[in-house]
Amino acid sequence: MSNKLCQLCNERRPALVRPKTGQKICKECFYYVFETEIHNVIIENKLFVRGERVGIGASGGKDSTVLAYVMKLLNERYDYGLELYLISVDEGIRGYRDDSLDTVKRNQQQYGLPMKIVSYADLYDGWTMDNVVARIGTKNNCTYCGVFRRQALDRAALSLDIHHLVTGHNADDIAETILMNLLRGDVARLPRSTEITTQSDSSPTKRSKPFKYSYEKEIVLYAHYKKLDYFSTECTYSPEAFRGTARAMIKQLENIRPSSILDIIYSGESMQLASSVQEQLPQQTTCERCGFISSNRICKACMLLEGLNKGITGLGLGSDRKTKKLQSQIPACAE
């Protein structure tokens, strides 16, 4: 076998070194193994049911753009029989989200998929992330955005009678989350952070991660070679410092041992919670104010909104004891 030919087909010249395996392969073989591995993950985990409506969380970034492209491709190639929709959230970040939404709109035309866009301003008393950051600064802004975004996706999905969302979380993201939970000693969150599909009894939608075992570098390479239209600028408001530290550690490990990302995921999957720890997890119910999932009487989104509207920064960000005390002072119905 010539070392100048693709190590998989032995016919074409290699175009890249595959990050996950170190193999020198051609573009055609890379497309095939990348797409086939995702298909196998979908089938082995029985992610979808024929005839199901599935919402694709679309931000315009590389992960969600490749996800939309691959989901459409595999749905047609293997006849999954799914109804696919793009769902996007406008957080209200001028100079970032407005530009990325333009990318999502182009993707909608390119892929021919129906699309739904919801905004923080419409859902949360006129609050945008620009307004939130102007009020609280950048210390906890990612917490606000994460809580609001999750509920916004739920609301958009329900408006389309969708009860299953797929997101572009990749292997790197999951490995980072596992590492963060371990460093915090938060083992109770390990099962949820490693599951490919998550849903609680009272959640309106379940969420799946078809890219659970897909490396970020390979997603970037796929988008590059396929010439996909995506928005590459990072969020204006810097990511959470702790996650950034975990990300740097993951990258260092990957440089030394490419399999480290999957090794961390497999390790997280193998860790089992003791029954005593499981019993300590909060029981999930629905928020008395907005009706969405919550482990408390008032959900975190409503708590955060209450703080913003009353000028009490940090409301809903403290310890469970402090949060529950504050919740007892909040009426179930908005004033």
Swiss-Prot record:
Annotated GO biological process: protein urmylation; tRNA thio-modification; tRNA wobble position uridine thiolation; tRNA wobble uridine modification
Coiled coil (UniProt feature): none
Annotated metabolic or biological route of this protein: tRNA modification; 5-methoxycarbonylmethyl-2-thiouridine-tRNA biosynthesis
Keyword hit for RNA-binding: yes
Record keywords: Cytoplasm, RNA-binding, Transferase, tRNA processing, tRNA-binding
Keyword Cell cycle: no
Top-tier EC class: transferase
Enzyme Commission number, as recorded: 2.7.7.-
GO molecular function: ATP binding; nucleotidyltransferase activity; tRNA binding
Domain of life of the source: Eukaryota
Predominant localisation class: cytoplasm
Pfam family for this entry, one: ATP_bind_3
Compartment annotation: Cytoplasm
Family: Belongs to the TtcA family. CTU1/NCS6/ATPBD3 subfamily.
HAMAP family: CTU1
Subunit (UniProt): Interacts with ctu2.
Its biological purpose: Plays a central role in 2-thiolation of mcm(5)S(2)U at tRNA wobble positions of tRNA(Lys), tRNA(Glu) and tRNA(Gln). Directly binds tRNAs and probably acts by catalyzing adenylation of tRNAs, an intermediate required for 2-thiolation. It is unclear whether it acts as a sulfurtransferase that transfers sulfur from thiocarboxylated urm1 onto the uridine of tRNAs at wobble position. Prior mcm(5) tRNA modification by the elongator complex is required for 2-thiolation. May also be involved in protein urmylation.
Name of the protein this chain belongs to: Cytoplasmic tRNA 2-thiolation protein 1
Species the sequence originates in: Schizosaccharomyces pombe (strain 972 / ATCC 24843)
